[in-house]
Amino acid sequence: MHCGLLEEPDMDSTESWIERCLNESENKRYSSHTSLGNVSNDENEEKENNRASKPHSTPATLQWLEENYEIAEGVCIPRSALYMHYLDFCEKNDTQPVNAASFGKIIRQQFPQLTTRRLGTRGQSKYHYYGIAVKESSQYYDVMYSKKGAAWVSETGKREVTKQTVAYSPRSKLGTLLPDFPNVKDLNLPASLPEEKVSTFIMMYRTHCQRILDTVIRANFDEVQSFLLHFWQGMPPHMLPVLGSSTVVNIVGVCDSILYKAISGVLMPTVLQALPDSLTQVIRKFAKQLDEWLKVALHDLPENLRNIKFELSRRFSQILRRQTSLNHLCQASRTVIHSADITFQMLEDWRNVDLSSITKQTLYTMEDSRDEHRRLIIQLYQEFDHLLEEQSPIESYIEWLDTMVDRCVVKVAAKRQGSLKKVAQQFLLMWSCFGTRVIRDMTLHSAPSFGSFHLIHLMFDDYVLYLLESLHCQERANELMRAMKGEGSTAEAQEEIILTEATPPTPSPGPSFSPAKSATSVEVPPPSSPVSNPSPEYTGLSTAGAMQSYTWSLTYTVTTAAGSPAENSQQLPCMRSTHMPSSSVTHRIPVYSHREEHGYTGSYNYGSYGNQHPHPLQNQYPALPHDTAISGPLHYSPYHRSSAQYPFNSPTSRMEPCLMSSTPRLHPTPVTPRWPEVPTANACYTSPSVHSTRYGNSSDMYTPLTTRRNSEYEHMQHFPGFAYINGEASTGWAK
């Protein structure tokens, strides 16, 4: 070795010389074994390497890391979450992302002092970057991945919050089985409808729905169109006559509600779960295309079947859009609630509210106001004050809302059957009036935290409507299922179920029922944290819905009698406007004329789909015996309010830009900005809700989804970019 080269080393010339020597050595070594195919592979690899290491890619990534992240002692970020941030950055800037290992080298180039730790329980631990935090000015900001989050956890000792900072991945639901569909033996079938054909159709339809669910979990949304087309246009000829039966149409509606509920729970298990923008866009695109796919698949099928399929699919699409909008509202509220400075100012403004005047105005608007209502308002005021004083996380506020609805609506309505709608209306009137008066009082007094309260008020109102609608839809599902099973003694009883929304049932003689008559809803407990008092569990509370319009979203055609028309030839409100063919008449359905155009190749194969029932089948409807006493609620999907009243689903309705700015008020003197130094929260990958774990058994409106082949799936892929990391799919959530 020449020592002259080491006295004054020239790094560029030395590295180029070493690289040239290595290349020559490799060429000499493999020159005799090089084939045409190998040369082609080498060229392809060289092109890929050149594309991955463009001159502008690494500098741009380093600049992006410098703008969005900083060194912070005591802060851990999951390696998968940071890589998902990087994939989102590459997609927005139209650059080719590198693999996870290469990205780790780029991170260490920007932050050399960064370390890696494996955190988590045994068998479920994940790698984390230790010593790096997200800047508050970053679009990926989350309080738990920032310096403030680390300081807040160390000071308060609430480390249980950090346990929930794992991003959700629909891939973790791979292998989910649908609950059992209705059993044909529990249905009241007309004599003209063969039981064997109905049972066969239910089996076929369950296989079809299970395939759709598995396809959605794998993020292959485009395959849903193929499954819909092949099932409905490949229907065996002997099954075509039963499709126009009102009983089969109702069965399809109930099964669709189960499927849509399962898909909604897989894509967005809770509105508090943080979702990236890429996943939100994929969900919205799927919701938009579903109706178009059904129009093609249901071509030339009976009109009543088409109507119920279209209606349920459109409502399901609205559900997905509503959930994404409410999810965004919750993430914006999370940023406000987790800021100590903002909550301190909110507490000060909250205690300056004229509670006595607001309470009097609220009671004046109520139909039957009593002293119990006044005590209830004061109690709720004190509970919210305690949450602000303790600087509780957003999960505690959601749990408080769950407890409030349970105490003021569920328990009160349980004392009197059929009074849920009246009790919910009474409580919703009081809740809305009180919240509006509080916002008005803060506006008149130019409260510095008015913007924060306005955002929290919007989120609270949406979530309360969400809970009340879920309760109402559960009650309507019970009534509909009783009608399908024929538990009503006469046709008039079944018609009364259909007309419930148009004509409310006549209450029994006596004073109107209200929350004031429940001692549990007005009794003021001793001072304690509202979080420490768990709300009693009840089935199907915190799922989905809103109590603005009391029309149930699953509208079915219910037979009043075997082949008998409605009395006086009047059309029922929830019935289809088109003529319904009699189930006793055998009719032919035209052959699908666009098979080649849409790529239809053959009939639907029902036998190739295995592992449908790894466990013995059990009746999923134990709460529906043949007697009139119903011991429990049915498990069906709740739905949401209309988009006309809460138009939060458009891209222009994002809350941060308009609320997170310091705007001048009518007050003549300078006022402190509403949300000082609070970044946007449009992308958050952490903090699933606490209450979802607590109410896991009671929130589902049907039997919880089971899992199959646990050993074959990795259920802890806690990030939506599983397709990029695992390499199991060609497209992913970040696409």
Curated annotation (Swiss-Prot):
Entry's Gene Ontology BP terms: cerebellar cortex morphogenesis; cilium assembly; dorsal spinal cord development; forebrain development; midbrain development; negative regulation of smoothened signaling pathway; positive regulation of transcription by RNA polymerase II; regulation of protein processing
Quaternary organization: Homodimer. Heterodimer with RFX2 and RFX3. Binds DNA. Interacts with GPS2.
GO terms of molecular function: chromatin binding; DNA-binding transcription activator activity, RNA polymerase II-specific; RNA polymerase II cis-regulatory region sequence-specific DNA binding
Gene: Rfx4
Disruption phenotype: Mice with an insertion of a cardiac-specific epoxygenase transgene into an intron in the Rfx4 locus develop head swelling and rapid neurological decline in young adulthood, and have marked hydrocephalus of the lateral and third ventricles. Interruption of two alleles results in profound failure of dorsal midline brain structure formation and perinatal death. Interruption of a single allele prevents formation of the subcommissural organ, a structure important for cerebrospinal fluid flow through the aqueduct of Sylvius and results in congenital hydrocephalus.
Region of interest: Disordered: 27-59, 501-538
Feature: compositional bias, Polar residues: 32-41
Chain residues forming the annotated DNA-binding region: 44-126, 61-136
UniProt cross-references to SUPFAM superfamilies, sorted A to Z: Winged helix' DNA-binding domain
The keyword Nucleus is assigned to this record: yes
PROSITE patterns, alphabetized: RFX_DBD
Coiled-coil intervals: none
Protein name listed in UniProt: Transcription factor RFX4
InterPro entries: DNA-bd_RFX, RFX-like, WH-like_DNA-bd_sf, WH_DNA-bd_sf
Stored Pfam families: BCD_RFX, RFX_DNA_binding
Keyword Transcription: yes
Organism expressing this protein natively: Mus musculus
Record-level GO cellular component terms: nucleus
Tissue specificity field: Isoform 1: Brain-specific. Isoform 2: Testis-specific. Isoform 1: Highly expressed in the suprachiasmatic nucleus, the central pacemaker site of the circadian clock (at protein level).
